[in-house]
């Protein structure tokens, strides 16, 4: 495992680079996750490809819950719907959703699906919305952590998602929902 240079409690376990995609079985992956849980890791996040290949099967074998990440375009929403069905069929009920690369200007012009449209189609709880942000590319190319960039809208969205996962108060005024009319109305009733 590789320890992150910025966060001492963050580790990365890279996938084996082998041509044989069946080198690790779902049973071995489940055992690895159980071992890591026993080592006192609070969260184990497994990034996996979408689809029915071995990497997906391995990832869900060791998972207690799932987060599906999608973009607001029709083909990605169809894929997300298929993945949600596969997760539920494999016992991972009530997956959460992250909507990535959302552009408010395109939503307002009805050129991109809104979070409400996506939620209506997929019928799962939205964990967070990450806006399109050029800082993502800049941070990636520099090897920086976007979550540390206090000026980045995507970085803020990542931090809000983490707060939600941790069960912390997440009433950030910069979230996408708070900037919409519906979000403003909701906020008025929630605040009192």
Where do the model's predicted regions map?
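Conserved phosphate/pyrophosphate-binding and hydrolysis machinery centered on Walker-type P-loop NTPases
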Residues: 22, 26, 151, 175
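Short helix/strand-capping connector loops at secondary-structure junctions
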Residues: 137-146, 163, 167
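A generic structural signal for short coil/turn motifs at secondary-structure boundaries
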Residues: 20-23, 105-107, 147-149
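Generic hydrophobic alpha-helical segments
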Residues: 28-36, 157, 161, 165, ...
